[in-house]
Structures are given as structure tokens and as C-alpha cells.
């Protein structure tokens, strides 16, 4: 990873010398193959990472309340109900860091991922702290991107855009299985019949294949549809939510560890207007 200009990172080592006060790392690199990138201001062939490798250009707003007990919200603190944001991070981040690290804190207590509402509710500030082998005083660098309401992204100037996805959903069960061979997840994405929002499932940075996907209520006369995904034989870490326009973000569930004491069976009926869930414990009838 490279640094911005200024005094904060000026004494950090960069190739054969110090980074200095005038060098400024680019916000993105058009070369998608990391092994083919050349280092800025130095020119040698060497992989490096920019803020745009870890953060999305556009943040996704959702007009629903997020259950923060079951899903990580990026340490965002605000009181507005019926509004949430999908994490604007990319799967590549999990090639280098675990889910627990992304949800956790730096040695100085600051969170690795932090989100704040801008003044006047004009947008969202996202800070991603990346650990480095730095100096005694600097153990991480900070990537910061501001996402503004009702505008497109301007990555050249590190200004993020904002869009809205109208959907809801659930994961059943919200449990990490001790034996992955026993794992079975039913995941639903409920949205307007005209929307084209899809879920992708990842473990670490590897995309998983779900067993099947079915759609309820595809009839255009019905307002909403439910896309149901069945994932078997593996745990997963996060869901990448994306649409046909290329906007994407990540849902990071907070899974509970499976307890081998009790067994539950669930039956879910996704109706046109209501969702009905029944369950039984063990061998109960």
C-alpha cells in the first residue's frame, strides 16, 4: 500500500528511500492485474494497492433498519431509522484480512473500519485502517473516502457517489457450523419484481457456488419477488450484493457458533404479503 502526501507518512521507507512530503499515492490504478503494476514515482514492476482496490466507488443506501446485532454496520453511529448502508468494501480486502480483523480494532483502539455521517447528513465518511510494518509511531495507514448524496463517483478526486437499493432479506440459520459438511443455509433477497439485485457468497476471498436459486412471485402483477438461495456443505463469511448497473457492497453477518446441544428445523413460507416461519426443536411434532 502507498501513502498520501504530507508530514504524517513522510519518514516511512519507500523502496530505496523515504516516502517524503511531496509524493502522493494515486487513488486508483487502471491495471487490474496487481503483478503488472509499476510503482508510482519509481517505475519498477511491483504489485501495490490503492484505496480503490479496497473501497467501492459508490456506497449503497438501503431504506430499512439494519439489525446491528446480526450484521456489522462499519461502526456507524446515527439515530435515523429506516435507513442503513451496505459496507462499501471489496472482496479483495478479505484476501489479506479476516472477518474478525475487519470488525476489530487497531492496537491503539481505533476500529479498522469506521463510518460516520457527514455534517448536514450530506453523505458518509468511510475510514479504512490498514496495518503496516511502519515505525514505532505509525503502525497503520488510513484510507479515507467521502461518499456524497445524490451524485456519481469521481474517483480521480477520491469522491465517492451514493445510490439506493430497495431490498430486504434474511439468512437462516445465522450460525457457523462446527462441521461444514452439515452446513445448510437458506438466504432470501426480497425486492421489487423490476429490480435485479443479486447475492454472491464468499468464504475468505473465494466466491462460493450455491446449490440452487429459486424465485417466488415473478408475476409482474405482484409488487415483490423473493429470490431464495440454497447453500450447502460450507460456511460462508459474507455476501456481496450487486445489481446490473455494477454497484456493489458487502453484507457482513455476525454468525453465532453452533451449539451441539439442540437441533431445530425451520419451515418458511414466503407469501405475497407476509412471511410465515415455523420451527420445531429436536423430535417435537
Model-derived features: where do they sit?
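Ser/Thr- (and often Asn-) enriched beta-sheet segments in non-cytosolic proteins
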Residues: 98, 114, 125-129, 140-147, ...
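Short glycine-rich, Thr/Ser-proximal phosphate-binding strand/loop in the N-terminal lobe
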Residues: 130-152, 283-285
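Gly/Thr-rich phosphate-binding beta-strand-loop-beta motif of the actin/hexokinase/Hsp70
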Residues: 256-284
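Acidic/polar, low-complexity linker and loop regions
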Residues: 77-102, 217-259
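Non-catalytic protein-protein interaction scaffold segments in large eukaryotic complex-forming proteins
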Residues: 5-126
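Short, small-residue-biased leader/transition segments that mark boundaries at the very start
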Residues: 1-2
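Low-complexity, highly charged intrinsically disordered N-terminal segments
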Residues: 122, 145-232
Amino acid at each position: 500500500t502507498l501513502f498520501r502526501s504530507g508530514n504524517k507518512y513522510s519518514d516511512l521507507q519507500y523502496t530505496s528511500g523515504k516516502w517524503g512530503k511531496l509524493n502522493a499515492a494515486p487513488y486508483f490504478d487502471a491495471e487490474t492485474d496487481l503483478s503488472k503494476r509499476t510503482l508510482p514515482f519509481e517505475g519498477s514492476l511491483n504489485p501495490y494497492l490503492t484505496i480503490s482496490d479496497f473501497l467501492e466507488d459508490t456506497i449503497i443506501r438501503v431504506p430499512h433498519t439494519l439489525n446491528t446485532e446480526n450484521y456489522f454496520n462499519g461502526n456507524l453511529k446515527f439515530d435515523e431509522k429506516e435507513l442503513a448502508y451496505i459496507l462499501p468494501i471489496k472482496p479483495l480486502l478479505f484476501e489479506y484480512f479476516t472477518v474478525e480483523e475487519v470488525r476489530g480494532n487497531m492496537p491503539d483502539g481505533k476500529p479498522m473500519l469506521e463510518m460516520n455521517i457527514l455534517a448536514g447528513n450530506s453523505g458518509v465518511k468511510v475510514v479504512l485502517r490498514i496495518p503496516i510494518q511502519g515505525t514505532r509511531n505509525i503502525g497503520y495507514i488510513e484510507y479515507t473516502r467521502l461518499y456524497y448524496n445524490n451524485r456519481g463517483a469521481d474517483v480521480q478526486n477520491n469522491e465517492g457517489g451514493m445510490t439506493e437499493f430497495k431490498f430486504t432479506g434474511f439468512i437462516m440459520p445465522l450460525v457457523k457450523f462446527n462441521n461444514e459438511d452439515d452446513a445448510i443455509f437458506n438466504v432470501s433477497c426480497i425486492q421489487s419484481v423490476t429490480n435485479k439485485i443479486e447475492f454472491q457468497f464468499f468464504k475468505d476471498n473465494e466466491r462460493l457456488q450455491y446449490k440452487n436459486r429459486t424465485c417466488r412471485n415473478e408475476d409482474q402483477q405482484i409488487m415483490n419477488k423473493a429470490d431464495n438461495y440454497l447453500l450447502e456443505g460450507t460456511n460462508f463469511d459474507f455476501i456481496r450484493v450487486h445489481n446490473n448497473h455494477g454497484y456493489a457492497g458487502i453484507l457482513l453477518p455476525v454468525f453465532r457458533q453452533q451449539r451441539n446441544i439442540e437441533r431445530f428445523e425451520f419451515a418458511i413460507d414466503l407469501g405475497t404479503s407476509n412471511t410465515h416461519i415455523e420451527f420445531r426443536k429436536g423430535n417435537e411434532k
